[in-house]
From Swiss-Prot:
Official protein name in the record: Elongation factor G
Chief localisation class: cytoplasm
Binding-site residues, GTP: 20-27, 84-88, 138-141
Molecular function terms, GO-annotated: GTP binding; GTPase activity; translation elongation factor activity
């Protein structure tokens, strides 16, 4: 590996992710890429639990990918850094954080199913970060696989402008290869070829000639429209060269105006090499994407950019933290500008703390290749960073920048966890600290009432796996409670001039603070859920005490007034107050801020909010009525019904609290023929009768 350490020519580097629905064959596709690029010598099969990218025990047992390992490989003198992303909905944060540091992606679809709910969600996340993509229709060897149907679902469900640049030769068991519409040749894999390493380039089979011409014409029309010179040439009846066609497809892909579609079967080792060629031909290099944007630490309005060049000051974004069995904490970073040697000192400009880079590696799944220098445009794993967590920026101490970070959703589901012995208590706190570093959507708090540790996550599977890792990696023996919903509280009306005076006179210096506030419902533009405005004039409260009132109010928001759930969506306006020369203190004003917020919230029509999930059930028509009836009985609201490849799809919004154990109920109602997916949608007010139950349960009545 050493001779190919880090390519300095960034035009030959691709940072890509492979994104897909849970079973579209993403890990198998990644495995094949690593095999053909010469890194894995034995192909790992997910079915045997041997895949090299899936490196946690739970992943191999469950056959799904949870942590996005970053892997480097080489293809025809180009370097590809791949970030494997999970397709299961509970791990959307892993997908989001990988998309943030990618330049391009390969979207893998199941040739039989086309676009599935999860692929739709991941596609939308990629839109959010504006990631150029190529599409790979996988599993073309499966019974029922249909390339043209899959392409149609991309147009209809994703609204994407897709351009097939290949069509399949044969299908299902007779799938042999692909017709390359750019070169107008067929590439077929014979049964003898060892693991599909060699393929033959042959003339297009006669029965496909017409179809190939039809799709080639569509491709050329799309290509010709990118450039006037090409359009003139095309309309004038001249042949476009292969270079011209590829250049135009590249332009369309990088600007996200179109998405090239390829096909194959990773499992049967067909079509993977042409897909690798397409990654190099059409996806952007670090030089093709806009420079990284950020701001001066502490001054969000002062924007700065960093170009992907080693001459610029060093900047990098930490996008993942993992625990390694020997090295302890590994931090994955994407370097956006400059270069830095291992052992150097940098600054975590998000937190303002100095960090020393220990060893630097480029990773292959979980084998490490040490490197001396980290340079712009590449992805590395670093040892030795103490305070850096996901989303933090590292930069040159003399030229600091805070790069745009990622937003992580709040958990929607919680379980209480109780260690069995005193030594388990210590292991538990260590495991929680380690897991929280790795996964920003994993939240922990101590329940004041019960003294239990409560952990929160993005879904039942997410929490199952976290608890499983505590038991396995950290040997924690603990009792785990039933999953609970993460409710919130808010207010419905504005209350004005609510006052509170905190005073305590006991010989010596007492405590005194008086505050008057308005409290009103509030939702910020960027999803902010709290705002504090100071309107005190004439020094009625000294300036140094104002932040204490704000801090007190925020403390009080952690436990709401109805059932002790966190308060959200409030704006506090501090109007007036009074202080005492001797008895006032920051503490006194903090207590006053806290108490006045509780008093005001109680008068402002407080309500409980619950997480609502967008649920999509795919069912045979015979069970449609039962499925809808069942969703209605769970307080669900049916949003839409449609037909999809012979089955019915019901889309509904259902409260999370009603969805526990749904998977078993759905199976028994439909004899196991229906399946569902659910993603968090929004928080909504709880109906009065349910609210009463929640309050009674919380207050123990």
């Amino acid at each position: 590996m050493a001779q190919k350490d880090v390519l300095t020519d960034l035009t030959k580097v691709r940072n890509i992710g492979i994104m897909a629905h849970i079973d579209a064959g993403k890990t198998t596709t990644t495995e094949r890429i690593l095999y053909y690029t010469g890194i894995s010598y034995k192909i790992g099969e997910v079915h045997d639990g041997a895949a090299t990218m899936d490196w946690m025990e739970q992943e191999q047992e469950r056959g799904i990918t949870i942590t996005s390992a970053a892997t480097t490989c080489f293809w025809n003198d180009n370097q590809i850094n791949i970030i494997d992303t999970p397709g299961h909905v509970d791990f959307t944060v892993e997908v989001e954080r990988s998309l943030r540091v990618l330049d391009g992606a390969v979207a893998v679809f199941d040739g039989k199913e086309g676009v599935e709910p999860q692929s739709e969600q991941v596609w939308r996340q990629a839109d959010k970060y504006d990631v150029p993509r190529i599409c790979f229709v996988n599993k073309m060897d499966k019974i029922g696989a249909d390339f043209y149907f899959s392409v149609r679902t991309m147009e209809e469900r994703l609204g994407a402008n897709v351009i097939p640049i290949q069509i399949p030769v044969g299908s299902e068991g007779d799938f042999e290869g692909v017709v390359d519409l750019v070169e107008m040749k067929a590439k077929v894999w014979s049964a003898e070829a060892k693991l599909g390493e060699k393929y033959d380039v042959v003339d297009i089979p006669a029965d496909l000639q017409e179809k190939a011409e039809e799709y080639r014409t569509k491709l050329l029309e799309a290509v010709a429209e990118t450039d006037e010179a090409l359009l003139d040439k095309y309309l004038g009846g001249e042949e476009l060269t292969i270079e011209e066609i590829k250049g135009a497809i590249r332009k369309l892909t990088i600007s996200s105006e179109a998405y090239p579609v390829l096909c194959g079967s990773a499992f049967k080792n067909k079509g993977v090499q042409p897909m690798l060629d397409a990654v190099i031909d059409y996806l952007p290099s670090p030089l093709d994407v806009p420079p990284a944007e950020g701001h001066v630490p502490g001054k969000e309005e002062e924007l700065i950019t960093r170009k992907p060049s080693t001459d610029e000051p060093f900047s990098a974004l930490a996008f993942k933290v993992a625990t390694h069995p020997f090295f302890g904490k590994l931090t994955y970073v994407r370097v956006y500008s400059g270069k830095v040697d291992s052992g150097s000192q940098v600054i975590n400009s998000t937190k303002g703390k100095k960090e020393r880079l220990g060893k630097l590696f480029q990773m292959h799944s979980n084998k490490e290749n040490p490197v001396e220098t980290a340079s712009a445009g590449h992805i590395y794993a670093v040892i030795g960073l103490k305070d850096t967590t996901t989303g933090d920026t590292l930069s040159d101490p003399n030229h600091q920048i805070v790069l745009e970070s990622m937003t992580f959703p709040d958990p929607v589901i919680e379980v209480a966890i109780e260690p069995k012995t005193k030594s388990d208590q210590e292991k538990l706190s260590l495991s929680i600290q380690k897991l929280a570093e790795e996964d920003p959507t994993f939240k922990v708090h101590l329940d004041q009432e019960t003294g239990q540790t409560v952990i929160g996550g993005m879904g039942e599977l997410h929490l199952d796996i976290l608890v499983d890792r505590m038991r396995r990696e950290f040997k924690v023996e603990a009792n785990v409670g039933k999953p609970q919903v993460a409710y919130k509280e808010t207010i419905r009306r504005k209350v004005e001039n609510v006052e509170y005076t905190h005073k305590k006179q006991t010989g010596g210096s007492g405590q005194f603070a008086k505050v008057i506030i308005n409290l009103e419902p509030f939702t910020g533009e960027d999803g902010a859920t709290y705002e504090f405005e100071n309107k005190v004039t004439g020094g009625r409260i000294p300036r140094e005490y104002i932040p204490s009132v704000d801090a007190g109010a925020q403390d009080a928001m952690q436990y709401g007034v109805l059932a002790g759930y966190p308060l959200v969506n409030l704006k506090v306006t501090l109007l007036d107050g009074a202080f005492h020369e001797v008895d006032s203190s920051e503490m006194a004003f903090k207590i006053a801020g806290s108490q006045v917020l509780k008093k005001a919230a109680a008068q402002a029509q407080p309500v409980i909010l619950e997480p609502i999930m967008a649920v999509e059930v795919t069912t045979p028509e015979d069970y449609m009525g039962d499925v809808i009836g069942d969703l209605n009985s769970r307080r669900g609201q049916i949003q839409a019904m449609e037909e999809r490849s012979g089955a019915r799809v019901v889309k509904a919004h259902v409260p999370l609290s009603e969805m526990f154990g749904y998977v078993g109920d759905l199976r028994s109602k439909t004899q196991g023929r229906a399946n569902y997916s659910m993603v968090f949608d929004s928080y909504a007010e709880v109906p009065a009768n349910v609210s009463k139950e929640i309050i009674a349960k919380a207050t123990g009545q």
